[in-house]
Amino acid sequence: MRLKAIKTGLRNALPLLYRFNPAGLRFALRVVIAALIAYGLARLLALPFGYWTVITAVIVMQGNIGGSLKAARERFIGTALGAGLGFLVTLIPVGPDYQWVRLALAIGASAYVVSLDARFRVAPITAIITLIVPQPGVSALAAALDRVVEILIGGAIGVLVALTVLPERAHRSLVKRIAALLRQLSGMLAIDMKGLHEPRDDAALSELIETSRDLIKTSVTLAEESSGERAARLTGGTAPDALVRTARRVRVNLIMIARATREPWPPEADRQLGAIFDNLGRSVAAHLSAQADALEAGRAIAPADGWEESFQRFEEGMAAFRANKENDALPTELMSRIFSLAFAVRQVKADLADLDDRIGEFAGTPRG
């Protein structure tokens, strides 16, 4: 039993040993190639602190081209800022016993800049290295310039390798994430609609909600990186931010539906509205899956036949439900859930129409 527990622990701690990940292997290859090129160039040019070139090439190498461009830009700007501040404080006349004053001023100034913009977070580290690390006889200005040049070389190597060695574009990764998100939302809706008639699987629903939240977070980062690719003219098409925002709105409304379907309806409500919402739920779930397929295929999408009819039947059913005076005896909490569900359904329809437009804008955009 103990051996089995150890094996399970290793499996949980080292999942890569139990799962083949082609994207991970491609990334590892890019990192190795970038590091070896940087190492060889540092040796060839006899750079004084050549290890910074290698480290930068590795740090800049991200999962996609957009991420590498962003990392290279931020590291170079932060390094230049920190090196500049490190050099400027050396101009302050202090005695040998008060070198800490320069160090404190450089760290404080660079840390303040980081508080304004986290993209410059390497600035304090560079300022410290500029003031402390230089070899005897090497001026602070020379140390600062050396570090900036080496970071620039390492960043350039990382970007070039990202562009040429099994390149992965943030745009393509974003499309995959949004498609996966839409399929997760389709599964969420299926569980929600089932919850109108019988106790639902809340554990499975919670897992889908958590997974969809992670996909949204990843998509926000990928959208930023994809925008960097567009700025560098590596990817065409429209800006991806609107696609992510619209997908997020759809998710929020589906969570509202999940809250409104947390308990089965009593027989009198289920008899009047159950079949209507079942039909509507199947239509929306199918459309979410179709949107995912269209996004991955790079084509526009139109609602399936019967789409508008299912919403028309929904509106007619809700109107009949409101007009039925016998429903005034239903519990207030139940009525609140029913009308909250109806509101969320209308919002979903509007957001899905917007999402159709966003997917249409992405149609034909090169996937990289």
Q: What spans do the regions from the language model cover?
A:
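Amphipathic alpha-helical coiled-coil segments and their boundaries
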Residues: 174, 205, 236-239, 243, ...
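Short, charged/polar, low-complexity loop and linker segments
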Residues: 194-200, 225-235, 323-335
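Membrane-helix exit/interface motif
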Residues: 88-92, 227, 258-262
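Oxyanion-binding "anion nests"
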Residues: 215-256
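Short, surface-exposed loop/turn segments at secondary-structure junctions
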Residues: 199-206, 230-237, 267-271
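Soluble C-terminal extramembrane regulatory/interaction domains of multi-pass membrane proteins
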Residues: 246-368
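Alpha-helical segments in soluble extracytoplasmic regions
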Residues: 203, 208-219, 275-285, 289
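A transmembrane helix-and-boundary motif of multi-pass membrane transporters/channels
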Residues: 1-214, 357
